[in-house]
């Protein structure tokens, strides 16, 4: 059983840009929409060429792949519905709250920042038992 990490991700910017992100992501944070896993990675019985390819790329299991590319064991869970606040005609914030296993999803946050240069990304995380915390602001 992992230590759970509580994450809050805020995306702020032009309403059309922020809402385009929300429309693409949906009500809940889903790492597969940011960094999609290989389609064949999750088959119960991998073919020999799949096993060889995974071994060659150093990602033989779904758990190893997700930890490498998402920074956490599983996709987001215990997610809350996104909260959208329209502050003005030119300013909107979308807030996603979710948990992750063991750590914050740093590669996912970095990918969101890279994929959405016109949105300011902030927020942060707290590890279960307050064993650590950090900010997403300015992460690249």
Identify the residue ranges that each predicted region occupies:
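Long, contiguous binding/interaction regions
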Residues: 1-140
